[in-house]
Amino acid sequence: MKITLTIVGYLLSALLMFAQKSGAYPAQDKLDFRYSPPEWQTAICLPDDPHKSLVDRSGELLYHYGQGGREFGTRISVRVKDAAVWVKQELHSPRVPIVRTYRRAEGLEITEEAFANTAIQPVKTPGAIVKRTDDGGILRNWAKPAATLDPSLRDIVVHMGGDIEYEVAVPKGSSRRIALALCEGYWNEAGKRIQVLSVEGTEKKTVDLVAEIGQNKAAAFWFDGRDTNSDGRISVQVDAAPNGSDKNTILSGLWVFALETKPDSEALLSGKLTSLSLADLHQAISDGPVRSDIILVSVKNTAAGERTFQPTLIVNTTLPLTFQPDQQRALIDNHEVVTASLKMKALKGEIETQRYIELESIKVPAGQTVRFFVQYYNGAASQAGSLNGPPNVGQALQCRERAVEFWEKKSKLPFDRVQLPDPGIQALMESSVRNIWQAREIKNGLPAFQVGPTCYRGLWIVDGAFLLESAAMLGAGDQARNGVAYELTVQKPDGRIESLTNDFWKENGIVLWTCVRHAQLTQDKVWLESVWPKLQLIAEYIKTLRRQTLLNNSPLDDGLNPAGTLDGGIGGTHDEYTNTLWNLTGLKSFIQAAHWLGKTDEAAKWQKEYDNFMLAFQKAVKRDMLKDLGGNTYLPALMGEDGTKQLPQRAQWAFCQAVYPGQIFSKEDALVAGMMAMLEATEREGMVYGTGWDATGIWNYFASFYAHAWLWQGNGFKAAQSLYAFGNHASPTLVWREEQSLKGANFRKVGDMPHNWASAEFIRLTIHLLALDRGNDLHLFEGLPTEWTHAGMITRLNGIATPFGALTMELKIAADGRSASLHVEPLSDPSCKNIIVHLDGWTKTSGEKVMKLDPRKDNEVKIPIR
């Protein structure tokens, strides 16, 4: 067995081992956000809202993600006093995303409350010929076409990871000549962005933008579209082709002409035909609802005398901005509107993209508070006057109260499925639920769960597996099903699942597991039978992958999976283990499902394949096992010599998931023991360090992968510690960034925020610490934190979905703290043999570590504690 590390790995590991021996991190027994990132952003949008409005740590409203060559193309804020100092930021409550930012200046206390106006209604726009129906955005000055071409070709509409969709209104059954333009401003090599252009009633056109057009060169494509289904609309769509590596779609121009207009691409691209068009891209409206967001500012005078101040509205945007004092508004990109309750007096300054609009001065008597607000509309400027936004401060206050009422009483989110005695963990649970529904959208009339509001605004196969599981656990399995069905839409004719890249082989195993777990949690064998032929094809493709390894030039992958993409810390294509681990997991889940459906012969057939697959894996493990500097044995994520060049902990996400939910190892497996010891040796701030994309940072929700592995191995105490460490890396507004730096280090961030795979993992881990299915038994309290067992505390699960039906149970600690009463309602599925209550670590027991309950009975038991 080799003992090897790179020089950097050696130094890092030595430092980490010393830190651990020196007691580098405190016990994680309370939630206090001690490792919160130094910057964050919080969603204030509504559930299923296509308008993903965010607020950052400073209180700025954030819009137009990715536009103008920066993270957010537009930022809107208010300055009351130049010398005001930021104090803190918090939410109205975990359920109510009103973000409160507190500042202090000499003699002044300033509170800014940012929230979405929940009462605003969509405004109908009659007569619009072109309507955009996807949820993508716009990027300005993205390409650099020739100066002789129409300047509008510099801009694109874009959909990150999705399709661009438009509708052209026509008399039913009629036709129009439609021109589309493309101009690639980013890639300079072929094969990157390949798009499929579709116009209803015509043949599709596939275009490799660089190979066929060139970088920063424009081309036009003409289609004679027809309303084939007589619904009064011609659909226009731009899809990413399967063989292109960049799945972000773009469109530089769209024009609608009468059929008699002669196609002339040169004239079109130079702008000479625009005046002849019936409509074009820039006249299109969005199909999304009109929204408004409010910053309500309260200024309290704590001084002895009257104070006068003059606020400033700051609009920082890369988009065109027009200040219209006669109409008392600022206009962004000719259609978005910013207004204020105070008079907008003058544009008093401009620094690059920042414009400073002077508002009228306000006098504040001693000891009194005055309020004003600014408001952002995402709707058309011509409609702003008809929107039912607040015209005065009194109505703005009413808007705030309506927002509170909406989130607390009308949002219908599954907040009440889990009740915990730790208010901090409860707060993160409720915020996680809310954020998952805020990131979600309605697409084609169905709910689509998404990872985040910005760079991860979409559903990926692996992220989606756990997002959809968490939704089903909370009783929203019917809503999650659309996401599960979506994962099957990327299946190819040969059975493979292909979404992220064409060698991300693990997507096959992930989809198998996702479908089986979803069917179990929703207790729906009929649905599982309906998709079974698709799952059979996936299993066959995993078998095909294994055969390919015996025919290629690499001896490292024999009997496993061909070289593929890892993700989660290591980029590129390699001989590696993450694909193998997940495809073993998927096959095991598929076999379990076959037994569940009574397909015993099929289960036996695939068990032989699985056993052979596992033998090949175990053989490779013996070849590639290494030791870290602490003597812990581990399997690197990369095979062969490449594995010696990475930090031991790098990209070990799939290993943890193979432990649980994969369950492909026995509890006694020496590989698991060594791997968990290796990962534990890297801990900083209670978290595994350097496993993600940032080798010197923390992948926040890896804490759940890690904790679930400990829990499955029987160490519930360690899993509970990880829950608190996970929570302490959230921001004070109860959200996570995907990855962040250690406290005090130069801050680097990776990924989206709020990141809702993190939200899903916090939900999954919290519930599984309390209730976890193992085979035909349901185990309770394997990871119950001892902090939740003090006098008077109540822990309750209310209708949580399990493979045995909905679980409702309550653990109530007596007022004197000496005993607990446990109530567990009957489970509906007869396949559950036992409910096993774990007593070790939190009860006064005489050698008994578990208690068995009958799952078919309504159980009421009293448990001595102290």
Please report, for each region that a protein language model flagged, where it lies by residue.
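The feature captures the catalytic groove of carbohydrate-active enzymes
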Residues: 288, 292, 353-396, 494-506, ...
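Compositionally biased, intrinsically disordered or flexible polar/acidic segments
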Residues: 123-281
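Active-site core of glycosidic bond-cleaving carbohydrate-active enzymes
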Residues: 457-494, 533-536, 540, 585-592, ...
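Active-site acid/base region of carbohydrate-active enzymes
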Residues: 335, 412-437, 461, 504-506, ...
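Internal amphipathic alpha-helical repeat/solenoid segments
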Residues: 446-459, 497-500
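Bacterial N-terminal signal peptides
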Residues: 6-17
